[in-house]
């Protein structure tokens, strides 16, 4: 990391070890310099910056000074790897060896392919969960908005008569105070009428 004397910003440079030394690097022994203030210019630089493990061919593993190439799979190899991943997301050492032998790949290539495939699968699952949560949040937000409108409408209504509700002990029917008063008057009239009838009957008997 170097500080430029004529600049107010830091000139940040990092060195990342490469897999094979390049002749143009001199005595850096396979170290590559990147300015983290700038975006990577090439796909290769981007992979170096994020620390991605490149896919390599075993034919170039022993060639000194030669840059390793990315692994290019055939359609059949890709199909068989996908089928194997569907059955098992993680391979046992024996499964990895058998699959590498069958596909004419190295065990390291198969292992790296499965690592990358698991990472893509996890990322896809996370994106689906995020989309689901966004939709659920939108639904809850809309439901909350409707409830708020209903609350405001209820608050705007004029309060009804504040008559107390009571329950009739005989019929167990809930009535308000006005009904109770009218019922009491009616019951009083009936009792008074019955009393008069009883008195008149007693007088006639005498």
From Swiss-Prot:
Gene Ontology MF terms: DNA-binding transcription factor activity; DNA-binding transcription factor activity, RNA polymerase II-specific; transcription cis-regulatory region binding
InterPro entries per record: HD, HD-ZIP_Homeobox_LZ_Class_II, Homeobox_CS, Homeodomain-like_sf, Leu_zip_homeo
Gene3D superfamilies in alphabetical order: Homeodomain-like
S-S pairs: none
Biased composition (Basic and acidic residues): 26-48
PROSITE patterns in the record: HOMEOBOX_1, HOMEOBOX_2
Keywords of the record: DNA-binding, Homeobox, Nucleus, Transcription, Transcription regulation
Residue ranges for the DNA-binding region feature of this UniProt entry: 66-125
Compartment annotation: Nucleus
Single GO cellular component term: nucleus
UniProt region (Leucine-zipper), positions on chain: 133-154
Record CDD domains: homeodomain
Function: Probable transcription factor.
UniProt-listed PANTHER family: HOMEOBOX-LEUCINE ZIPPER PROTEIN ATHB-X, HOMEOBOX-LEUCINE ZIPPER PROTEIN HAT14
Protein name: Homeobox-leucine zipper protein ATHB-X
Organism: Arabidopsis thaliana (Mouse-ear cress)
């Amino acid at each position: 990391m170097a500080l430029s004397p004529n600049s107010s910003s830091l000139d940040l440079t990092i060195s990342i070890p490469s897999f094979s030394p390049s002749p143009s690097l001199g005595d850096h022994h396979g170290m590559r310099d990147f300015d983290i203030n700038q975006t990577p210019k090439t796909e290769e630089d981007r992979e170096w910056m994020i620390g991605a493990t490149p896919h390599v061919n075993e034919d170039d593993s022993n060639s000194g000074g030669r840059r390793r190439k990315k692994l290019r799979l055939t359609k059949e190899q890709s199909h068989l790897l996908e089928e194997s991943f569907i059955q098992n997301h993680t391979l046992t050492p024996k499964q990895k060896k058998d699959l590498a032998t069958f596909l004419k790949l190295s065990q390291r290539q198969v292992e790296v392919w499965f690592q990358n495939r698991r990472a893509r699968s996890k990322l896809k699952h996370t994106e689906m969960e995020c989309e689901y949560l966004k939709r659920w949040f939108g639904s809850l937000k809309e439901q909350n908005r409707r409830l708020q409108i209903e609350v405001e409408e209820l608050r705007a209504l004029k309060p009804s008569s504040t008559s107390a509700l009571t329950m009739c002990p005989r019929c167990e029917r809930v009535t308000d105070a006005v009904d109770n008063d009218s019922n009491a008057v009616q019951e009083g009239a009936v009792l008074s009428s019955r009393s008069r009838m009883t008195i008149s009957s007693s007088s006639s008997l005498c």
